[in-house]
């Protein structure tokens, strides 16, 4: 009975490992084939970019009115401390947003309400949205801060501008003067800015970091202390993924629930890695392998791999330093992929030169007696241990006189 249960558990582990291998390969293929539009990002789907949106000013100046670009230019943020009602005009100069003492309201009949739901400009606005219709206001917030995506202040072209294609390694102002008109009472206020192409860094140093970490994990996993090594690697992968996640949270204005949902894969990876570490610390390497594989898939493929474009883009959606963010992404990829391979190969990684390090059982030279726990030496097989003669004692082989 116990043998059948053990056999079933082995089959279950084998199935989990094979399934994990399929998921790992599929995730790598999808990640390598995904373009920027297909890549995942924390919060509201913002991905790394080489386009920087700048807000240059408000004309005329209005005390208490602040407008800034956030989410690496994907959204505009308006803070109204004027005590008056500020109306943001849409693409056809219709009332779109209204920010005042009573909160933030959105005109549900404005075409901008539909168009701004996506960062890609829609080909056609459906019926029901009419710039000439009487505004139908719906309150969306009780504060005096409005955040919205505005196509006028965001590069939404399907390709790079001609000037960028000619010299992509240099900075270029690709949109010199975007404008978003607003109304404050009877006054018209213009918020203006520009969009600049900023070339990104070379991704190869970060690729090298990931590859070196993969090699280091596999090499260290071949030692006699495989359980301890895998536990440390899993813990480091959780730490680097946590740094990446915290940076993305700090750089996104998305609501808490949205961010929790977007990072569910990372949270799952942390929990599963914790289970694997607990088993490894008890020396249960074989039972920890499926958990290591699943944790690596969640952390490396679902967490870090979709943000690989950040390695080669200048504008990174993170509240942390871009270099630290890129390092966290590359490290999570390297540690996670190395951990997945180590979990898949298991005993096949045991390198004799490393597994036989001094202090291990396999390092004992042949013929050397091993020391048991009680301090006594065991006799090597094939040899007889001779007891030393006592000084002055009679010899058994000596004939009696």
Regions found by a protein language model. Name each.
Residues 1-42, 399-400:
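Hydrophobic secretory-pathway targeting helix
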């Amino acid at each position: 009975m116990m043998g059948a249960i053990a056999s079933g558990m082995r089959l279950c582990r084998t199935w989990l490992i094979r399934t994990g291998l399929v998921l790992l390969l599929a995730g790598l293929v999808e990640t390598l084939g995904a373009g920027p539009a297909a890549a995942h990002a924390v919060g509201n789907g913002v991905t790394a970019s080489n386009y920087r949106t700048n807000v240059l000013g408000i004309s005329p100046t209005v005390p208490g009115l602040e407008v800034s670009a956030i989410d690496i230019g994907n959204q505009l943020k308006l803070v109204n401390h004027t005590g008056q009602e500020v109306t943001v005009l849409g693409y056809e100069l219709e009332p779109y947003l209204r920010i005042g003492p009573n909160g933030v309201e959105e005109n549900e009949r404005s075409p901008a309400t539909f168009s701004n739901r996506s960062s890609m400009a829609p080909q056609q606005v459906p019926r029901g949205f009419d710039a000439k219709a009487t505004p139908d206001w719906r309150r969306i917030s009780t504060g005096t801060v409005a955040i919205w995506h505005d196509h006028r202040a965001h590069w939404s072209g399907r390709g790079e501008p001609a000037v960028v294609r000619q010299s992509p390694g240099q900075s270029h102002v690709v949109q010199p003067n975007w404008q978003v008109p607003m109304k404050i009472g009877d006054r018209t206020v213009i918020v203006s800015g520009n969009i600049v192409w900023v070339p990104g860094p070379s991704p190869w140093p970060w690729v090298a970091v990931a590859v070196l970490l993969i090699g280091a994990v596999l090499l260290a996993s071949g030692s006699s202390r495989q359980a301890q090594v895998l536990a440390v690697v899993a813990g480091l992968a959780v730490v680097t993924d946590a740094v990446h996640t915290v940076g993305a949270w700090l750089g996104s204005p998305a609501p808490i629930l949205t961010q929790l949902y977007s990072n569910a894969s990372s949270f799952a990876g942390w929990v599963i890695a914790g289970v694997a570490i607990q088993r490894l610390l008890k020396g249960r390497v074989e039972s920890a392998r499926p958990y290591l594989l699943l944790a690596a898939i969640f952390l490396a493929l679902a967490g870090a791999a979709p943000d690989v474009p950040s390695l080669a883009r200048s504008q990174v959606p993170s509240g942390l330093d871009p270099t630290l963010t890129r390092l966290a992404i590359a490290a999570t990829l390297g540690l996670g992929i190395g951990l997945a391979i180590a979990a898949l190969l298991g005993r096949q990684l045991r390198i004799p030169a490393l597994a036989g390090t001094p202090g291990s059982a396999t390092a004992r030279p042949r013929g050397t007696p091993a020391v048991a726990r009680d301090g006594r030496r065991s006799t090597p097989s094939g040899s007889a241990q001779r007891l030393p003669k006592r000084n002055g004692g009679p010899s058994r082989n000596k004939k009696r006189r």
